[in-house]
Amino acid sequence: MIMSLPTKAKVVIIGGGIHGLSTAWKLSETYKNPGEIVVLEKKDTAAGASGIACGVVRNNYFQPAMRELMAHSVSVWESDPKAFKYNPVGYLQISPEVMHEDVASIYKQQKAIGYESEFIEGEKDCMNYMKGIFDDWQAQGITSILHEKKGGYALIKIQLKRLKKNLPPMVVR
C-alpha cells in the first residue's frame, strides 16, 4: 500500500528495522503529534538485516562503547519479555585458544560495567562446564567460555511488526 508522505516532519528516520523503529519509539516520547516523525522503509519492517541478524540479544562486543549500549539494550528487552517476544536464556561464546585473549578482555569489560557473566578457562574446565549444561557435549579444543547470564533471543520479525503497529501515529513506509 502506497501512503502519501507529509510535506514536512520534525524527524525523518531512514529504515524500519530494529534501529529505525527503536529510535522512532524513543523519540515518540518527545514528539507527540501525528506526522512529526516519519519512518521511511523501502520494503517491509524487518525485511533487511534486522529480520535476519537481530534476534540474538547479547553483550558480546569488542568496543567498550558498544558494550555499554548493549547492556542498556538488554535491560530494555528484559523490561517486558512478553511484549518483545524475548526469551532470556543467556548467551554462550565458546572459543578455541586463538580467541582466548580477546574473550578474556570482553569478560573484564563486562565485569567493569556490572554485566553478569562467567568466564571459564582451560580445556578440561570448559569440557566439564559444557557437560554440566549439555550432558552429551563432545566438542574438543575449547579453551574458554564466556557465559553471559543475561541476554537471549527474540522472535524479531514478530516483535518489529508489533513495535511498528504500536508506535504513535506516524508514517511507516
What are these regions (language model features)?
Residues 4-6, 31, 86:
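Short, flexible hinge/linker loops that cap or flank conserved catalytic cores
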